[in-house]
Amino acid sequence: MDIAIHHPWIRRPFFPFHSPSRLFDQFFGEHLLESDLFSTATSLSPFYLRPPSFLRAPSWIDTGLSEMRMEKDRFSVNLDVKHFSPEELKVKVLGDVVEVHGKHEERQDEHGFISREFHRKYRIPADVDPLTITSSLSSDGVLTVNGPRKQASGPERTIPITREEKPAVTAAPKK
């Protein structure tokens, strides 16, 4: 019995599953584009190379922003939570971690019914006191979690170097 073995780098243009990894090219949690599900006429060509997924604009540019910053005087986290009301959000500190949780029950939007839930955890830097963490929600739906960084204890000073006449390392006694 003869079995045809195809080289994995050679794609047959009319084989419908010539690119099964296309769905795995996306970033986890990113939305699917129509081109991810259906082949275009150009993608059926054996010479077509799909552009890398990093060239696609991530969806958090318009929704789902999550950004952590370490500035000179403070630690801050900005999180887009515009789909949640303040009552549907919870921010808590557990040891050296800030945990943000949001959940809303099913409700109608322009596409149908939707329910959402998320959990985010951010490690608090060592120079931020967990008791000083605060949070606020802006009018455009961005949750900000802040904490001031501890300042160095005292001003910088130069320590003079003194010279000693005796050696720091002496010879070990011989046996």
From Swiss-Prot:
GO CC, one annotated term: protein-containing complex
Compartments in which it is found: Cytoplasm; Nucleus; Secreted; Lysosome
Binding site for Zn(2+) 2: 104, 106
N6-acetyllysine modified-residue sites: 92, 166
Phosphoserine sites (modified residues): 19, 45, 59
Gene Ontology terms, MF aspect: amyloid-beta binding; metal ion binding; protein homodimerization activity; protein-containing complex binding; structural constituent of eye lens; unfolded protein binding
Family: Belongs to the small heat shock protein (HSP20) family.
Stated name of the protein: Alpha-crystallin B chain
